[in-house]
Amino acid sequence: FKLKFMKNYIFKDKKIVIASHNTGKVKEIRAMLYPLKVDVLCANDFNLKEPIEDGSTFEENALIKSSYVSKNSGIASLSDDSGICFCDLNNEPGVYSARWAGEGKNFSMAMSKINDSIKKVENPNYNCFFVCALSLSWPNGKNITVSGKVNGKFSWPPKGNFGFGYDPIFIPFGYEETFAEMHPQFKHSISHRALAFKKLKSLCFPSLKN
């Protein structure tokens, strides 16, 4: 049964659409998919609007995006829904991580909001974690969704010029640099997105090297 399940989800298409309008995410996912030797497109290539993400989990929102783009493009679609959760803030912003940056995607403002909020917490532990859910959907409705998580500490002030989003204020456990200070290639090997993609590779892209 397990072997049959795995065969049903092996990616054999010649094109794939990244269901995202976030240039940082598109760049990271495109790099991960590069060894596939397939045409990698993105939602902007089809002038698709962003669907309403009303899921209560990262996995639900990832599925909403991949299903929407796959259905409207007629091509298999890979989506990412990710965010950061601060233990001192009851795991906020979580699935609302992008919304905290506002319509203008001002993550400097969002990071300042995080810092201001944590300052008000008595005896903060500064623990936080990034979560990434990846969802691969086909036009026929078939789908598979996986997730990855990396734990770390909140760091202030923001440091680093690489990465995007909340990377400048997150230091993964076992390291002394923020995600934004790490070379992108190294960050891609240890991030929440990398962990989720490793799971997806084993199920859908077995030809890719680990």
Residue spans of the language-model regions?
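Short, Lys/Arg-enriched N-terminal segments with co-localized hydrophobic residues
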Residues: 1-5
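Anionic-ligand binding patches
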Residues: 7-17, 23-208
